[in-house]
Amino acid sequence: MVQEELWAAFSGPSGVALACCLVAAALALRWSSRRMARGAAARARQRQQAALETMDKAAQRFRLQNPDLDSEMLLALPLPQLVQKVRSGELSPEAVLFSYLQKAWEVNRGTNCVTTYLADCEAQLCQAPGQGLLYGVPVSLKECFSCKGHDSTLGLSRNQGTPAECDCVVVQVLKLQGAVPFVHTNVPQSMFSYDCSNPLFGQTTNPWMSSKSPGGSSGGEGALIAAGGSPLGLGTDIGGSIRFPSAFCGICGIKPTGNRISKSGLKGSVYGQVAVQLSVGPMARDVESLALCLRALLCEDMFRLDPTVPPLPFNEEVYASSRPLRVGYYETDNYTMPTPAMRRALLETKRSLEAAGHTLIPFLPANIPHALEALSTGGLFSDGGKRLLQNFEGDYVDSCLGDLISILRLPKWLKGLLAFMLRPLLPRLAGFLSSLRPRSAGKLWELQHEIEMYRHSVIAQWRALDLDVVLTPMLSPALDLNAPGKATGAVSYTLLYNCLDFPAGVVPVTTVTAEDEAQMEHYKGYFGDIWDKVVQKAMKRSVGLPVAVQCVALPWQEELCLRFMREVERLMAPGRQPS
């Protein structure tokens, strides 16, 4: 009866007019929301530019007042030596901060990695505790780290103009340890990408080659640190977001166990998803700097400010150990074919470790495709992407996200139909689509239990071989700009260890050679699908770019992971910076 009345109402001339009005209203609403998004982008760029001008003026003013300062010498110091010289009084905290301000401003001109200057850092110099482990150290922060009075936009219009009311716990701890947070750095829109672009601040580029991605989602950090604009940065990682920028930009980074470092007060685009753990971790030019940062963060202040974090101080004995290690390794996960440079990096590192007295044992976690598709992707999008999509209402979708948002917007039945039709020819794409379906509470509990059981099964595999650590390939070199969003499957080497919640870090070990480049012409991948084709195309013109390996340990063994990374660095690190 109701349907008949509705049909009658819309079938006459008045109904047609009403329908036209509804369509016009919808179009007007869409235009209005897009206009608001354009306005938000314009305001964000203006604030970014004003902040950078303030930053430059502050650095220039200090330079005029201190013409004899040797900034090049200061900027070249490894972080531990820098801290030592500041503590001894040989260098002043002011000289360090303003030297890095000037360098960060210069790096930003070539990479667009800085979103804002945290101008209160100048006043903080007077308040920094002189006994802190990071006394006088300028620290850059991924934009999601909340700082009082500053936006954390995540590249989304809806977050522009909403400054944080207080510092997140990690920023509070950094300040209590004497560090000086001085800039926020760029991220991909919503942080669900391993590229680095958004409609508010634009594209961040790789300091090694401007046509290449710096990685993401901590891409601004990777670019700034690699080019010498920051001695230490903090990022987050839920699928490789610390490890991709570190590998693409040729620096070191570690993703700790999910709850080793506090996440309290961080800005996110999706809250409540716990099946796949987010981690907070440091990024720097060398492993010793990562260790210094973890020493500083794993302190009583953090355990007091966030009692949900296990009170586990940094274990110096494990990190300082020099005993030979039993190292599991695999050349491929059989999901993403390693590039010639990746395979060579892995094998050269393996040989160097063996020559140094370590034992290398073949090892491959079981059932990786299922872990990546059903468990990891299923966990990340257990609501079908509904909460993530809410961030994009009335906003532009950045091209760095590829087709993710369009796919998430498809009806559930259409995703299922496409997955069924694609499975015989494109199994990875079919697995990805089928994992995006929304789940009931009961099905989500089943998924979380399955992830827990998978974690225990891999630990059992690991212990059956009596392994200390594992060495794996790391996706590298850097892909072309906008390519990561079209090569979703290539996250396999990193995403697995978010699903497992194992600490994992990356260390640069070599660079792409002309021979690697020539062999890449024959790269087909294991499946020949669009993801494989994008990887093959997006890694061309890469001679000289850094290539990394990944080092993994069991949960809560960050110190052992760092010890292994330090050994790899000692044996392999090429020790170059982008020009």
Swiss-Prot record:
Q: Which PROSITE patterns match?
A: AMIDASES
Q: What EC number(s) has UniProt assigned to this enzyme?
A: 3.5.1.99, 3.1.1.-
Q: Which residues lie within the membrane without crossing it?
A: 404-433
Q: Where would you find this protein in the cell?
A: Endoplasmic reticulum membrane; Golgi apparatus membrane
- How is it regulated at the activity level? inhibited by trifluoromethyl ketone.
List the protein's name: Fatty-acid amide hydrolase 1
Q: Check the record and name the InterPro entries matching this protein.
A: Amidase_CS, Amidase_dom, AS_sf, Endocannabinoid_amidase
**Phosphoserine sites (modified residues):** S241
Query: Changing C249A: reported impact?
Result: Loss of activity
Residue ranges in the Cytoplasmic topological domain are 30-403, 434-579
Q: Which domain of life is it from?
A: Eukaryota
Q: Where are the transmembrane segments?
A: 9-29
- Any keyword Iron? no
Q: Name one GO biological process term.
A: fatty acid catabolic process
Sequence positions that bind substrate: M191, S217, I238, G239, G240, S241
Reported function: Catalyzes the hydrolysis of endogenous amidated lipids like the sleep-inducing lipid oleamide ((9Z)-octadecenamide), the endocannabinoid anandamide (N-(5Z,8Z,11Z,14Z-eicosatetraenoyl)-ethanolamine), as well as other fatty amides, to their corresponding fatty acids, thereby regulating the signaling functions of these molecules. Also catalyzes the hydrolysis of the endocannabinoid 2-arachidonoylglycerol (2-(5Z,8Z,11Z,14Z-eicosatetraenoyl)-glycerol).
How does this protein lie in the membrane? Single-pass membrane protein
What GO CC annotations are associated with the protein? Answer: endoplasmic reticulum membrane; Golgi membrane; organelle membrane
Q: What is the effect of changing S217A?
A: Loss of activity
GO molecular function terms here? amidase activity; fatty acid amide hydrolase activity; monoacylglycerol lipase activity
Q: Which PANTHER family match?
A: FATTY ACID AMIDE HYDROLASE, FATTY-ACID AMIDE HYDROLASE 1
Active site residues per record: K142, S217, S241
Description of how the protein assembles with itself and partners? Homodimer.
What are the protein's UniProt keywords? Endoplasmic reticulum, Golgi apparatus, Hydrolase, Lipid degradation, Lipid metabolism, Membrane, Phosphoprotein, Transmembrane, Transmembrane helix
Provide the reaction this enzyme catalyses.
N-(5Z,8Z,11Z,14Z-eicosatetraenoyl)-ethanolamine + H2O = ethanolamine + (5Z,8Z,11Z,14Z)-eicosatetraenoate; (9Z)-octadecenamide + H2O = (9Z)-octadecenoate + NH4(+); 2-(5Z,8Z,11Z,14Z-eicosatetraenoyl)-glycerol + H2O = glycerol + (5Z,8Z,11Z,14Z)-eicosatetraenoate + H(+); 1-O-methyl-(5Z,8Z,11Z,14Z)-eicosatetraenoate + H2O = methanol + (5Z,8Z,11Z,14Z)-eicosatetraenoate + H(+)
